[in-house]
């Protein structure tokens, strides 16, 4: 397949996400209203990548760029060759902080490339490819679908259930200056876990989903408890437990590591959010640590196509 696909530019917008939510390791994900916006179009030859916003110094502008590499998966799959490509990225999602920046890049690259080549693949196929590239399904499923997602990745296929969340809770993200790559955060995890710890997390993961759906937010504190990963990752975020404690004392419903960290995420009622932001912020300030705090909502729309080429 070649030419005849110069009908213009495609633009997509993909949300950030928080995964695990405590006990739901590699299973739970919630989309959040921070975004990566990607414009993509074919050009005569070469590769041009322009980056604005978060990570401008860290996002590659060559063939190692994750958005480009994801787009290439689509092009090779459907047989598009000998095309130059221009990609423009406007990014709001902090990199390497546990907020799904790589998932947004992967989903965005796949979705944009699919639109650019005539929408050959269904969104379900895009999701399966995204999970294959990412290696797990929690963030990419949330990024593509929006809302709260429970997902499993089995034999290269994603199975999921999704539920939109209302805006009566805030997701408060405390993002430190230092990043922790997911591969580093996974290396500190044990190869085997205690059977009782597995049972502990299984029960709380199921309970957490029910609590969010039924809006029994006062039960989130116990529902978000974890025994499988956070205690091992504490060495990478040494003030983690203190942040959790301060958040709960300030009135948050729950606090946990966002994904692999190092971002600390708290869930709060809008009425308590400012107090939680202030009290947890003190943990960073007292240590002289730079951080940013975001007051976010669940993004229920998921990845969106903002502009479609004329031939689609």
From Swiss-Prot:
Gene3D superfamilies: 3.30.230.10, GHMP kinase, C-terminal domain. Keywords: Amino-acid biosynthesis, ATP-binding, Cytoplasm, Kinase, Nucleotide-binding, Threonine biosynthesis, Transferase. It catalyses: L-homoserine + ATP = O-phospho-L-homoserine + ADP + H(+). SUPFAM superfamilies: GHMP Kinase, C-terminal domain, Ribosomal protein S5 domain 2-like. Signal peptide: none annotated. GO terms for biological process: threonine biosynthetic process. Its EC number is 2.7.1.39. InterPro entries: GHMP_kinase_C_dom (IPR013750), GHMP_kinase_C_sf (IPR036554), GHMP_kinase_N_dom (IPR006204), GHMP_knse_ATP-bd_CS (IPR006203), Homoserine_kinase (IPR000870), Ribosomal_Su5_D2-typ_SF (IPR020568), Ribsml_uS5_D2-typ_fold_subgr (IPR014721). It is an enzyme of class 2 (transferase). ATP binds at residues 94-104. The keyword Metal-binding does not apply. Pathway: Amino-acid biosynthesis; L-threonine biosynthesis; L-threonine from L-aspartate: step 4/5. It is found in: Cytoplasm. GO terms for molecular function: ATP binding; homoserine kinase activity. GO terms for cellular component: cytoplasm. Disulfide bonds: none annotated. Catalyzes the ATP-dependent phosphorylation of L-homoserine to L-homoserine phosphate. Belongs to the GHMP kinase family. Homoserine kinase subfamily. This is Homoserine kinase. It comes from Caldanaerobacter subterraneus subsp. tengcongensis (strain DSM 15242 / JCM 11007 / NBRC 100824 / MB4).
